[in-house]
Amino acid sequence: ALSEYDQSLAEAKRTNRMVEALELFKSVCNNRAFSETSIMLFLNKKDIFAEKILDSDIAAQKPFADYPGPPKDFNSGVLYFIQKFKDCLIDDDFNDSFIHVTCATDTNNMEFVLDSTRTIIMTDNLRRSGFLGSR
């Protein structure tokens, strides 16, 4: 979740949750088994993130000391973490992929996300069946 940038794992107190998410994302996305697969990244709990950054500076977290700021700025914080996830990719091609900043309790937002997900699945299926060119 986007809001977990200042939290540690319950099972490994020294491991930052966002760092763990970045490492897992990198591992999955750069696996050859997924080389022809579109990527959908959901950065959830944007509502909690928006509240949390008012009191918990991103740059104050050791793994994210390079956050340029400004502090307490929702959009800058979101863009910073989106870039962190993009930086995990060996192949910089994010054309057929989508990043969604979500709040699961926001029905309008989730409706848009589900529509985008359907589009990704249909596009991948059309590509695999030969109706669309390869990436």
Where would I find each of the regions flagged by the language model?
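Conserved GTP-binding G-domain of TRAFAC-class P-loop NTPases and closely related GTPase folds
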Residues: 2-135
